Amino acid sequence: MKFGWIMANDEDWEERKETVKDSLESSIPAVMVYEEDIEKVKELGNIKTISKNPNSDIVVIDKGDDLTILFDAKKEGKETGVFISIECKEDEEYASEVSRYDYVDYIILEGKDWNIIPLENLIADLFDENIKIVSLAKDINDARTAYEILERGVDGVLYVPKDINDVKDFATLIEKMNSEKLDLDCATITKVEAIGSGDRVCIDTCSMMEMGEGMLIGSYSRALFLVHAETVENPYVATRPFRVNAGPVHAYVLCTGNKTRYLSELKAGDGILIVDKDGMTREGIVGRVKIEKRPLMLIEAEYVGGEIVRTIVQNAETIRLVNENGAPISVVDLKVGDKVKLKIDTNARHFGMAIQETIIEK
């Protein structure tokens, strides 16, 4: 996941305070501040501070400073980083060197005459290292470029905003950078059958979902059906656009980081993946999980190659899958031959993580 920080370095505290408040409102996780501002920033809200001060949440020193500062900070459980201004090849080599120290979590890079080439070199050089690369950016285009360099891009951007709108635009960019596109396939319905009652899970999120959005859920990790959010108007019950009536407690749901979780494991505050009919994703937050006994329905489908996959949902008109045209279709209206959208995964799962292993799911 890409992340972004804000630099609050205006001359006047009142201006810096507004930058911090804008960052809080835009869900920016951390701000780089002057050492004397740390306590004042903490009074404004729950946001991480970045500075040289050992009392910061993320302790960052400049190139040439004593690295034992970071070693000591790491022992105290702090995150650590080195700010490096890239002015010559030696600076790039220094960045590569300190990135291999196990007590350094971040390198924060500011390009001078050259910016893109040093970033490309370091992204390639440090591909397998346990380090996060952060690039300083002073406008949205520079931030976007940094996120996209060599397709992989930097892990994060330290952004210097011009005004409140700049902070919000940056937050929007981060959300877009984290919006992965998944490949969705279609499967043909072969059976729809009422199977009795069981414990069903509703996922109420902190997001308002739109038509075409839902979550990827299924009984098998290799085939997750797109279950539509409760956004469709009907004459009997009010819509719940924040909700996906997901399925029984045993079912998998796809979460951020390409990990699956059992529906029964979810709780308030957990991250969840919202997926639309075209496979575009965005991150959501679970606000509440409801588990209730409800009548259930087995849905069986066949996809290319003759593979049969199944899922179970509540037997009710308001539960919908998504058909081949991207439209929601109620599970009570499903019939043999209908096509619905799902995500096929050839990997097995171990504690929710994709692995190369043979597994049989029935």
Swiss-Prot record:
<keyword id="KW-0520">NAD</keyword>
<dbReference type="GO" id="GO:0008652">
    <property type="term" value="P:amino acid biosynthetic process"/>
</dbReference>
<dbReference type="GO" id="GO:0009073">
    <property type="term" value="P:aromatic amino acid family biosynthetic process"/>
</dbReference>
<dbReference type="Pfam" id="PF01959">
    <property type="entry name" value="DHQS"/>
</dbReference>
<keyword id="KW-0028">Amino-acid biosynthesis</keyword>
<dbReference type="GO" id="GO:0051287">
    <property type="term" value="F:NAD binding"/>
</dbReference>
<protein>
    <recommendedName>
        <fullName>3-dehydroquinate synthase</fullName>
        <ecNumber>1.4.1.24</ecNumber>
    </recommendedName>
</protein>
<dbReference type="GO" id="GO:0102042">
    <property type="term" value="F:dehydroquinate synthase activity"/>
</dbReference>
<dbReference type="InterPro" id="IPR002812">
    <property type="entry name" value="DHQ_synth"/>
</dbReference>
<comment type="function">
    <text>Catalyzes the oxidative deamination and cyclization of 2-amino-3,7-dideoxy-D-threo-hept-6-ulosonic acid (ADH) to yield 3-dehydroquinate (DHQ), which is fed into the canonical shikimic pathway of aromatic amino acid biosynthesis.</text>
</comment>
<keyword id="KW-0057">Aromatic amino acid biosynthesis</keyword>
<comment type="similarity">
    <text>Belongs to the archaeal-type DHQ synthase family.</text>
</comment>
<dbReference type="GO" id="GO:0003856">
    <property type="term" value="F:3-dehydroquinate synthase activity"/>
</dbReference>
<keyword id="KW-0560">Oxidoreductase</keyword>
